[in-house]
């Protein structure tokens, strides 16, 4: 049996302000730092050790991972960072308030943009400073691969090949793996692992900063999965994620 640990980054400053973030590189909030520390302490308490870690190219995921590894006393392990684990790109919605956007376009429309499988938000023009072609961290990535907007289907199309080619390979070699990423890149991975339908993934709420453990068989099929921590706290965190994008 293999184990895989997934962690959505701790609350970011834009999570706190209820803004669409996507590929915008924002820092963790104070609460997010505390969530990452708690995640590290939970993993330490349960005796977790890791050989290799994976993360995105965004600070909030990197910082969450670094804090967790520091709490574990495992900052020395190899870390691979890739744009393929970045959050889903929210196009022209990036930087907008979710509740205000719901008031303007309607909750149903915003829910479709946020959670539908194959409907992306309005795209960013390449002249927009928010477009990834303007960001030096992506200068070595072919321009045609950099999104102007994404739906979950698009996110899956970049996450799953990386899972197959890189992450799964390390697990099958017997390495203990932790992945620190984002709500939608992790939803993409969970959909694949659990073979969720497009309808079921719409209802999937992954809370910030709470370790999600997968136990996998020899073929990397899930045996079971579970969150570490207090059940009531986990439930409230999931409800908080589900409530984003609603009128308040």
Curated annotation (Swiss-Prot):
Active site residues of this protein: 9 (tele-phosphohistidine intermediate), 87 (proton donor/acceptor)
Pfam families in UniProt: His_Phos_1
EC number: 5.4.2.11
Binding site for substrate: 8-15, 21-22, 60, 87-90, 98, 114-115, 183-184
Catalytic reactions on record: (2R)-2-phosphoglycerate = (2R)-3-phosphoglycerate
InterPro entries per record: His_Pase_superF_clade-1, His_PPase_superfam, PG/BPGM_mutase_AS, Phosphogly_mut1
Record-marked site positions (Transition state stabilizer): 182
Domain of life assignment: Bacteria
Biochemical pathway: Carbohydrate degradation; glycolysis; pyruvate from D-glyceraldehyde 3-phosphate: step 3/5
Keyword Isomerase applies: yes
Gene Ontology MF: a single term: phosphoglycerate mutase activity
Coiled coil: none
GO biological process, one term: glycolytic process
Presence of the UniProt keyword Zinc in the record: no
PROSITE patterns hit by this protein: PG_MUTASE
Annotated family: Belongs to the phosphoglycerate mutase family. BPG-dependent PGAM subfamily.
Function in brief: Catalyzes the interconversion of 2-phosphoglycerate and 3-phosphoglycerate.
Designated name of the protein: 2,3-bisphosphoglycerate-dependent phosphoglycerate mutase
Naturally occurring in which organism (per UniProt): Borreliella afzelii (strain PKo)
